[in-house]
A protein has these predicted regions:
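N-terminal hydrophobic targeting segments
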Residues: 2-3, 108
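Conserved C-terminal alpha-helix-loop-beta "cap" of PLP-dependent enzymes
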Residues: 83, 88-156
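Active-site C-terminal subdomain of aminotransferase-like
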Residues: 3-92, 97-102
Length: 156
């Protein structure tokens, strides 16, 4: 990552930190910076059914993830495997819908390739590109290995 959390907090009024792709069981941490927190956020969240009843579970996960840089180490693994996936897709001649340095890669697939790849890998429909192509999302996580990328390369 080329920005620190304190720098991000200076640049934003609010941001969130995802947990599941870094190994958390569930949850995201919403961070309000400075004086930008809304009035009474917890009751508002509860009223809309978006608060885990046992919120301590989510908090403990983030406490562990931010100990000794674990969150960033895990995130780096996801991004490195996503970039390896990107290279494989590029080598196979696939076009990218978006340029992204993250753990998510958005690829324009011929519809028949999408059907075939889905038999071997988990990909997410993103949007219809044209009559014969679809944009899909490939997403890596803390658990994605080079062996996973190699297995997908064999399918491609």
């Amino acid at each position: 990552c080329d920005i620190t959390l304190p720098e991000l907090a200076q640049l934003c009024d609010v941001f969130y930190i995802g947990g599941t792709k870094c190994g958390a069981l569930c949850g995201e941490a919403v961070v309000f910076c400075g004086m930008h927190a809304p009035a009474h956020p917890i009751p508002r969240i509860k009223q809309h059914g978006a608060l885990l009843a046992k919120g301590r579970l989510t908090g403990v996960q983030f406490e562990a993830l931010f100990t000794d840089g674990l969150y960033f180490e895990i995130g780096r693994q996801a991004i490195e495997t996503a970039q390896a996936l990107r290279r494989v897709l590029h080598e196979r001649g696939y076009q990218f819908f978006l340029e992204t340095p993250t753990n998510q890669q958005f690829v324009i697939l011929p519809n028949e390739d999408m059907v075939r790849i889905r038999e071997h890998a988990s990909i997410e429909y993103w949007e219809k590109y044209d009559e014969t192509h679809t944009v899909v999302r490939f997403c890596t996580s803390w658990a994605t290995t080079q062996e996973d990328i190699d297995a997908l390369a064999a399918v491609l």
